[in-house]
Amino acid sequence: MLVTITCFGLNQACIKNHVVILNLLAPGRILEYHCYSNVDDLGVKRLDFNATPFTIKFHDEIPNLTKWNCILRQGPNNSMEYSYDVEVYKAGPRLIPRCGQLRAWAARIDGIYFARKYNTPLKRVLFWNK
């Protein structure tokens, strides 16, 4: 007796999603950020002006909806008087995870900017809360 088993599946691994945080405020102006998800808390960190961007790399959690928030803070003389709690990534309801998604967020003096694709200009989407 000969038994043959055939398995079908995805041949390609799911590329991790990326949330990128940039400090484009001004020379000497520090961006403080606290990023957290429904399963991880990365703690409070600081990013100098034009420093290497901070990147969160992750896979979507199925069946849970992956969600990342970052509280961004900045101010003159590092007073951190301006802030915004930004939902930087949210997976929609789905059975198949998203792969290779980009969410780029940049802090500038006049607001918070966003891009969803590489090589596209950042657009202002939020204004700072005081």
Swiss-Prot record:
Keyword Signal tagged: yes
Highest taxon listed in the record's lineage: Eukaryota
Glycosylation: residue positions: N64, N77
InterPro entries tied to this protein: Self-incomp_S1
Pfam families: Self-incomp_S1 (PF05938)
Keyword Metal-binding: no
GO CC terms of this entry: extracellular region
Keywords associated with the record: Glycoprotein, Secreted, Self-incompatibility, Signal
GO terms for biological process, alphabetical: rejection of self pollen
Subcellular location: Secreted
Family the entry assigns: Belongs to the plant self-incompatibility (S1) protein family.
Name this polypeptide is given: S-protein homolog 30
Phylogenetic classification of the source organism: Eukaryota, Viridiplantae, Streptophyta, Embryophyta, Tracheophyta
